[in-house]
Amino acid sequence: GLKFRIPSFGGEVMSRLGVAVATIPVGELYMALEMGTIDAVEWASPSFDIPLGFHKVANYYYTGWQEPASEQQIVINLQTWQKLPKDLQNILEASIAKAREYAENETFYKNVIIWDEIKKKYPNVQIRSFSPEIMRALRKATDEILAEESEKNPDFKEIWESQKAFLAKARTWTKMGDFTYIEKTGDVEAEQNFTASGKK
């Protein structure tokens, strides 16, 4: 079967579909792809993938499904934190929030630029998405694993139920906000380009 470097929950899902899941350190990924040790690798986004050179040894770039968002964490010993004066706690909290905001914005910007470069500079790379059939199978396996984990772990169940409830609300707003904007402005741009070309 397909030999795929994909860790954690995404790896569990892929494994249920018959994929041979591997976990390989980042420093060995390029060579593993080049030598055929693995057939595919899940990493991050264009701003991380292209600098690692994956486009040189892999001709297909699939859009992701397993990580709709990333979570950035900082772990501080509670006793150490409580010993800090309040002003230093405030400074640290503000600094962490600013660093997260900067990282998110910088990554978004770099992804925009590099995604455009992929299409122009690397014509060998074919951008694909999984078929509806594969997505349904991935969804089914995902739901099964989530249900199993919820039965075994009350904390997991509580967190997952909370996330599901928020996701239902978030989807509604995302469709109204982001999707509607992209859809409507895309139509306007297409119409303007069509008119500018002299066709009506």
Give the positions of each predicted feature.
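N-terminal secretory/targeting leader peptides
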Residues: 1-200
